[in-house]
Amino acid sequence: MGVFRTRFTETFGVEHPIMQGGMQWVGRAEMAAAVANAGGLATLSALTQPSPEALAAEIARCRELTDRPFGVNLTLLPTQKPVPYAEYRAAIIEAGIRVVETAGNDPGEHIAEFRRHGVKVIHKCTAVRHALKAERLGVDAVSIDGFECAGHPGEDDIPGLVLLPAAANRLRVPIIASGGFADGRGLVAALALGADAINMGTRFLATRECPIHPAVKAAIRAADERSTDLIMRSLRNTARVARNAISQEVLAIEARGGAGYADIAALVSGQRGRQVYQQGDTDLGIWSAGMVQGLIDDEPACAELLRDIVEQARQLVRQRLEGMLAGV
């Protein structure tokens, strides 16, 4: 049993209230297994795999590396090439996966099918109204992305300090806090704000087991909290990415006005982002990173990272916070 017992740890059968959510091109077997073995809830990213058959093989590979629970992320976003979502969903179910994280567009049909097969569903969203809809659809938990997060933070620009308690005030299902988390201070803050766990992405990029080029990890460690850009705001498809030559070029095109997706499609191509992670040239394409870069200056193993987060959180609660109580 872990130090912290929450609705999240109880619902998903993990030791710590820490999740490694979906990360395109990164959520592979070695990453997920390392987090699972460390006691967190890990996910493979379905669309990192080129086909449903490849996803099934990756699930099998992950099971060779861990005997602990892990899930699969299925992101539902507009793509240049149609995605066979039903086939990916079937591969997840047939593989016996018990936890799925959905994100993006309306997950209704997928939630119903997953639940019919006994799969627990976490839906990641960026607004309380979306979380309430997911709850009505029957999800087992929601992951709430604050404005600080990497990837797609939505269009409302509400930071986690407000978004989390606003969600906790209205939701009944467990809440996972996403965006800006890297250490025990964040875990304690999230729990105090009403969350049941934290989700980390950028922090897991800078771990020993993360299957990306060392130069990308070094760039994260060297960055500060200002080293991100918000691109595609003019298209209402905002993405927070690491600031580089490509993100600046995209912003320049948007600033001229009247730009459509076709004007930036080649620059924001997912394949170029994949090459960044593989080749280590951080100016080669767009890649996701959150403001939390400013809190990252090391590259621990996942087991060390989770151990240190939980221990720091325990000490904060036992020593700092209890010590502030005036004789209560």
From Swiss-Prot:
It catalyses: a quinone + NADH + H(+) = a quinol + NAD(+). Transmembrane segments: none annotated. GO terms for molecular function: NADH:ubiquinone reductase (non-electrogenic) activity; nitronate monooxygenase activity; nucleotide binding; oxidoreductase activity. Keywords: Flavoprotein, FMN, NAD, Nucleotide-binding, Oxidoreductase. The keyword NAD applies. Signal peptide: none annotated. InterPro entries: Aldolase_TIM (IPR013785), NMO (IPR004136). Its EC number is 1.6.5.9. FMN binds at residues 22-24, 75, 124, 150, 178-180, 201-202. Its cofactor is FMN. Binds 1 FMN per subunit. Belongs to the nitronate monooxygenase family. PANTHER family: 2-NITROPROPANE DIOXYGENASE (PTHR32332), 2-NITROPROPANE DIOXYGENASE-LIKE PROTEIN (PTHR32332:SF20). Catalyzes the NADH-dependent reduction of a broad spectrum of quinone substrates, generating the corresponding hydroquinones. Highly prefers NADH to NADPH as a reducing substrate. Also displays a small NADH oxidase activity. Does not exhibit nitronate monooxygenase activity; is inactive against propionate 3-nitronate, 3-nitropropionate, nitroethane, 1-nitropropane, 2-nitropropane, and the anionic forms ethylnitronate, propyl-1-nitronate, and propyl-2-nitronate. Has no azoreductase activity since it is not able to reduce the azo dye methyl red with NADH. Monomer. The two-electron reduction of quinones by this enzyme occurs through a Ping-Pong-Bi-Bi steady-state kinetic mechanism. This is NADH:quinone reductase. It comes from Pseudomonas aeruginosa (strain ATCC 15692 / DSM 22644 / CIP 104116 / JCM 14847 / LMG 12228 / 1C / PRS 101 / PAO1). The lineage of its organism: Bacteria, Pseudomonadati, Pseudomonadota, Gammaproteobacteria, Pseudomonadales.
